[in-house]
Amino acid sequence: MTVIIASHWGPQSKQMLPPEPPRIILREVPVQNNQKEHPPVQEIKTVSSKSKEHRVSSSRKIPDHFDVGPRFYMNVPADGSEVFEDDEKDVENECWAVIERIGSEDDKFEASELVEYRDHDWYIALAINKEKTPDKANYQHLLYSYRGGIQRIILTPQQTDSIDKTPLVKYKIIGDGLYEVLPIHSSLPQTGLISPKYRYNKGVELRIFGIVNWIDFVLDDDHQTHRTMVWTDAVGPIYLSAADRANIRRKLLLTEMQIFAPLRMCHITVKAEFNFSIPDGSPIQWTISSFQPLIEESEKDPNIGRNLWPARVLRFDDLVVTKKTPNGYWLKSQRLEGHVNVFAGANQIGIIESAGEKYATKGSMMAFVVPCYQNSTFAYFEALIAGPPRVVMIITEGRFLNYCPKTWPPSVRKMRDQYQKEHVLKSEVRSSPICMKQPDYCLKSLRGFSECPF
């Protein structure tokens, strides 16, 4: 339907007559395209005869005394269906409801990571090799996971194509010889986070990023007896003895406090021997051949934690001590009671007791934890560092502030970028000196166009 609102001002004369009320003309708009018929569209057009030429305006407002009967919408189908502007807000509210139900903003990780890394039915595995089965119909994949060790599973060509582009996958046993397998896109080869190399029936070499746990090299007299754990998402924990730390220290010519600072990221190359005689379920002994700590150029360097922080490292802020043993402390979560049990080893005793005996037994603790498995089943979380929140923040030099999820919702991302632009970057902007604006000035003297004598 076409709605034409016309008004007549009378003949052109010196005497101005009062305007007549506009007339509404309704007529059908013919369909222009014969290939595909669309429902008729109702349009609003206003015709004014102030001049000799009639001008059609689609944005003119209809007077209030014509706001009767059904309303007419621009470019709205005649069947009455409407598109609401707040659909995006509804979807966003639903997403936040899911996040609030599964986790909270304080957890500093997104809901997808909660589902992926807290559902312990999944195996997070490194894809080492694949080869066709004797019947040439399926593929046999050689996988290694911290939870299940070496596994040889048979997948269909469709499943093989879905995980063929990433070296890190997750799979779940759904039946006798049946598996559900999914890729982990954050470990794509172009990201550089995981670079595997397989020597057929000889060994595996892997370049990967890891994170170091806490050992007090100054105040702890027993630090030589503690093992340093380097956590990696692909192959789990790699333990270093005091002799291994000393060898790395001699190669890098740095102190152990600089190399193995608490929660310091590192880039390592690990190797392991492998042959076909190793049965399924056997663990692999990894050895570190190259160790490079990522020492921040400035305090709280935001790029390290945002891009390279292992996704399976979780943070809890509501832990309380339940039991003390000669080997360490056991803690549990107040909010997720019965689901989160954390073990802090002997290297964490000093930091947990740093705030006094009363706080050590009744106070809330902060901990960065990684999963620990026994007999291919999840047993508990092991703490990289645990203690009073303020002490943990001081010891880690604020590195936990770098731990932010890989993706925020668009609204939060927009607010963060706007704050960064207005309050952080704006105060750091300084006008460049003249020698930086025009580099040839450094070759000129103030008295004329002459080069420097040297």
From Swiss-Prot:
Biased composition (Basic and acidic residues): 50-61
UniProt keyword annotations, A-Z: Cytoplasm, RNA-mediated gene silencing
Domain of life of the organism encoding this protein: Eukaryota
Gene Ontology CC terms, in alphabetical order: perinuclear region of cytoplasm
Tissues/organs with expression: Expressed throughout the mitotic and meiotic regions of the germline and in oocytes.
Gene Ontology terms: biological process: regulatory ncRNA-mediated gene silencing
Keyword Cytoplasm tagged: yes
Record's subcellular location: Cytoplasm, Perinuclear region; Cytoplasmic granule
Record note on what altering G387E does: In gg663; disrupts inheritance of small RNA-induced gene silencing
Region (Disordered): 31-61
Subunit structure: May interact with pid-4, pid-5, app-1 and prmt-5.
Function text: Involved in gene silencing mediated by a class of 21 nucleotide PIWI-interacting RNAs (piRNAs) that possess a uracil residue at the 5'-end (also called 21U-RNAs) and that guide the Piwi protein prg-1 to its DNA targets for silencing. Not required for the biogenesis of 21U-RNAs. May also be involved in gene silencing mediated by 22G-siRNAs (a class of 22 nucleotide endogenous small interfering RNAs (siRNAs) that possess a triphosphorylated guanine residue at the 5'-end) and 26G-siRNAs (a class of 26 nucleotide siRNAs that possess a guanine residue at the 5'-end).
Designated name of the protein: Protein pid-2
Organism expressing this protein natively: Caenorhabditis elegans
Origin organism lineage: Eukaryota, Metazoa, Ecdysozoa, Nematoda, Chromadorea
